[in-house]
């Protein structure tokens, strides 16, 4: 067994801790992680942004996975929370001499209030995921679940909790060149004011399908190898499944270019089709990243 720790800060606006955790690695099938880190929910949330094709997360990830949640809890937490998690790999097969896990599990208990915040109620939230590789290298099927609650009013009494439950199913394929990923999320969120008799359950859902294909080429003048991939994503979200005016569909296309091993330029164009709006929305984004 051995220890691994990580401490990551953000000084862009005001100093704050982003990641701060310790891993106790005991065996392939059983490990412990404690501190502040990304919750084990969905494919996209635990992944590094440098591996994703979009500058922004899909709507359903943002709204139901601790980024800009429909219940406004853990907003701007980047899918992170404070807690303890067990994780490991069970069973494996070999492909070209490399051992590939068949089943990966993660199960954690969290405060449920986002990063750099103390617990706001007396309960704890549970998040867990299972990923299965069905014998094909690069192919994974997954499901994850979040069972939690939050304070309807942080200034109110402790027993004014509302449910915040989410369930996901997804699959992805990551080959040498082709990358395809899709997830569906369904959620139940308690909303409203119990004191006024206006408490209700908000049912939300959505899914996305994203794809990209890597091309490699070498610059004749410099001899430097470049990596570039066209990317695209179909992104559908229903904040309230009973109200069609909350439906929105985003169509994204872009280019992911690595002119050097530690330099990345990502450009996205998104066409936003919201039922509540008469006109389409247009968003053009560019992001430059440098790895050290």
PLM feature spans:
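Short, hydrophobic/aromatic alpha-helical segments in well-folded domains
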Residues: 126-129, 167
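Outer-membrane beta-barrel pore domains
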Residues: 6, 21, 36, 135, ...
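Hydrophobic secondary-structure block in the mid-to-C-terminal portion of proteins
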Residues: 118-120, 287
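Outer membrane beta-barrel
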Residues: 1-115, 122-124, 131-140, 208-221, ...
């Amino acid at each position: 067994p051995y220890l691994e720790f990580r401490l990551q800060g953000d000084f862009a606006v005001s100093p704050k801790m982003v990641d701060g955790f310790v891993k106790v690695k005991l065996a392939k099938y059983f490990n412990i992680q404690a501190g502040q880190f990304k919750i084990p929910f969905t494919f996209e949330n635990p992944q590094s942004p440098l591996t994703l094709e979009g500058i922004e997360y899909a709507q359903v990830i943002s709204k139901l996975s601790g980024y800009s949640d429909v219940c406004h809890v853990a907003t701007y937490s980047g899918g992170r929370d404070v807690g303890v998690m067990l994780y490991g790999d069970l069973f494996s097969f070999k492909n070209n001499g490399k051992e590939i896990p068949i089943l990966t599990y993660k199960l954690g208990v969290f405060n449920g209030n986002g990063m750099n915040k103390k617990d706001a109620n007396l309960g704890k939230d549970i998040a867990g995921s299972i990923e299965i590789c069905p014998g094909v290298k690069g192919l994974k099927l997954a499901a994850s679940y979040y069972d939690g609650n939050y304070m309807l009013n942080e200034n109110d009494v402790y027993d004014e909790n509302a449910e915040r439950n989410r369930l996901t199913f997804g699959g992805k394929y990551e080959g040498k060149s082709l990358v395809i990923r899709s997830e569906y999320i369904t959620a139940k969120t308690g909303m409203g004011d119990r004191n006024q008799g206006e408490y209700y359950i908000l049912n939300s859902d959505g899914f996305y399908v994203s794809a990209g294909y890597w091309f490699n080429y070498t610059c004749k003048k410099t001899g430097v190898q470049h990596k570039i991939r066209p990317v695209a994503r179909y992104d559908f979200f229903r904040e309230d499944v009973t109200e069609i005016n909350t439906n929105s569909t985003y169509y994204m296309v872009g280019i992911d270019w690595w002119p050097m091993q530690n330099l990345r330029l990502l450009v996205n164009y998104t066409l936003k089709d919201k039922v509540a709006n008469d006109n389409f929305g247009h968003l053009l984004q560019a992001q430059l990243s440098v790895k050290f």
